């Protein structure tokens, strides 16, 4: 595996994949702290029509916390709607992942990326296998995972957000592990 020094070049954009969850918020804040003075750090969000409306409040709160505008991208083909993807594609999850993630998030984000971009993913210490799977499926896509690098788990991220005074998204308060269906 390459080191960050091998992955991140002086002209790389650092692109945070912001999902409106605690982990991606903390991963983005850590990336901004580490690279904000030397690189163009961008925050991107793929809007989902089916997500809880409180995610937009959390996104706005995180814009204030990070001091950065979060660019929101919206799929047009499927209306940013997970159910439309399932109806048209006729599967939920295959060997390469969930169809909604691929079509409503990854493909959309791919249209925005530039060569040399380094993705920041909010995989937590408990999700190292997801990072390994991602790297295996995307060997040409440079990616860093600040939470795994620092041994931070889901509960750590929730606690960090709580200490900022930002209220966690409603889906957490309703008892779900994540802010989305993914």
Located regions from the model:
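Nucleotide-activated chemistry modules centered on ATP-dependent adenylation/adenylyltransferase
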Residues: 1-182
């Amino acid at each position: 595996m390459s080191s960050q020094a091998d992955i991140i070049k002086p002209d790389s954009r650092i692109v945070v994949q912001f999902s409106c969850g605690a982990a991606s918020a903390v991963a983005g804040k850590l990336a901004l702290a580490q690279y904000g003075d030397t690189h163009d750090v961008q925050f991107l969000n793929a809007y989902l029509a089916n997500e809880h409306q409180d995610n937009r409040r959390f996104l706005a709160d995180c814009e204030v916390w990070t001091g950065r505008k979060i660019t929101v991208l919206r799929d047009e083909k499927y209306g940013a709607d997970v159910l439309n993807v399932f109806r048209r594609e006729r599967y939920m999850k295959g060997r390469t992942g969930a169809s909604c993630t691929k079509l409503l998030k990854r493909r959309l984000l791919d249209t925005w990326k530039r060569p040399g971009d380094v993705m920041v993913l909010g995989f937590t210490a408990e999700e190292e296998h997801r990072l390994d799977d991602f790297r295996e499926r995307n060997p040409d896509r440079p990616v860093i995972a600040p939470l795994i690098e620092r041994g931070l788990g889901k509960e750590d991220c929730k606690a960090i957000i709580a200490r900022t005074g930002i209220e966690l998204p409603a889906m957490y308060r309703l008892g779900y592990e994540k802010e989305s269906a993914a």
